[in-house]
Amino acid sequence: MSSHYEAPIRKPLVTGNKSYHDVSVDIAAAIEGKANKQWWIVFSIALVMFLWGVGCMIYTISTGIGVWGLNKTVGWAWDITNFVWWIGIGHAGTLISAVLLLFRQKWRMSINRSAEAMTIFAVIQAGLFPIIHMGRPWLAFWVLPIPNAYGSLWVNFNSPLLWDVFAISTYLSVSLVFWWTGLLPDFAMIRDRAVKPFQKKIYSLVSFGWTGRAKDWQRFEEVSLVLAGLATPLVLSVHTIVSFDFATSVIPGWHTTIFPPYFVAGAIFSGFAMVNTLLIIMRKVSNLENYITVQHIELMNIVIMITGSIVGTAYITELFIAWYSGVEYEQYAFLNRATGPYWWAYWAMMTCNVFSPQLMWIKKLRTSILFSFFISIIVNIGMWFERFVIIVTSLHRDYLPSSWTMFSPTFVDIGIFVGTIGFFFVLFLLYARTFPVIAQAEVKTILKTSGDNYKKLRDKK
């Protein structure tokens, strides 16, 4: 009993007096039942957004990237803004799965599966932007170090854009393996419950012959720990490499050593906000309030509050170093952000990312589901503006006043971005109907320590 003991002060992580069988039934319900009206409405909207985005991508590829709002001064704009934003959103999944696993945090078990799915779907969206940004996406394979017949013809390993290729591909592959490994016992549970022969065959195939023997569990736990060890450095390295796209250049406002930690903190910040957005909706639609509790939402809000404070500190540090450096160009770059033509984007960023998360210090607000949902949306809007401010305001006024200009997005820029949001939700909604959205095998392991009925029984003794 002592090895399973949990202090009474800790709130239960599973409510509703659940048994092992109840957990299986509740999590399999979304897969075994029929989609409700709300699911079809949201899926239809997401599909229309996705198709609009596909149309804009086809138009871009067939006509050229001149259909975007780019000009000779602002060569990177919405494409790279959206790329960095999507990559950042993916970071929370790896952090919840890998880092919290290594720290043995039990509250991760109800949210890690959907957070990992979000990571993979976000990285897919991010990967689209560098490909279409090339202008000739049919030559995208040129950025891969493929052996060729030309001997010394090789990729430029000094290019940060090549580092992005390695970062994204490594991140996607490790996240996918980690996600699928965790899914094996859950797929096996769906397989064993399946009534239709075709469904049974599909889930048998994807569960890789899982039987639930002690040897299966031993290997499962070993592989999970090894993959967590591999994925933890990726949380830091991927967004660090993305920050090098900017930090290794000589543009004022980009050439700064604070970018790697600043980008990583911002990525975790926006990622947790997106996890909150998705899980608050999912817990309501899929009747999972007993598994994704207010306790989970509150803990994620605390992470958002802390990382928001780190991001705010980074903003202030940037301003201080620009002044302290004595470099006129650096000072102007930051002054222009706050008071120039794009002042509205800068102050939207500051309001959303620095001021709004500080409201989470108030317990009543951070335990409010409605307020948490509102703040999670605000934070993601703010993080998009942060990337826009970093990229566009640094480029539109550089060293030569004669080349100063403004950037305005076209309907194609907007369409591609809206399309990726639609694609993301199409993937997530299909996932919610075909995959177990909560790691039921892991939730069952904490039922006797963190389940409310067991805690009540123990307290009575």
Annotate each predicted stretch with a short phrase.
Residues 1-38, 141-157, 186-222, 295, ...:
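Extramembrane terminal tails and long inter-domain/linker segments of multi-pass membrane proteins
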Residues 2-18, 57-69, 73-76, 83-214, ...:
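Transmembrane-helix bundle segments that line or gate the permeation/cavity pathway
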Residues 29-57, 148-346:
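Long, contiguous internal "core" modules enriched in hydrophobic/ aromatic residues
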Residues 53-60, 127-137, 314-321, 382-393:
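C-terminal TM-helix exit segments that contain a strictly Trp-centered aromatic cap at the helix terminus
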Residues 86-96, 164-182, 265-280, 348-359, ...:
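Hydrophobic cores of alpha-helical transmembrane segments in multi-pass inner/ER membrane proteins
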Residues 106-107, 361-372:
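Membrane-helix interface "capping/anchor" motifs
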Residues 251-255, 327, 365-366, 391-411:
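Extracellular/periplasmic helix-loop-helix junctions in multi-pass membrane proteins
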Residues 371-381:
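Central hydrophobic cores of alpha-helical transmembrane segments
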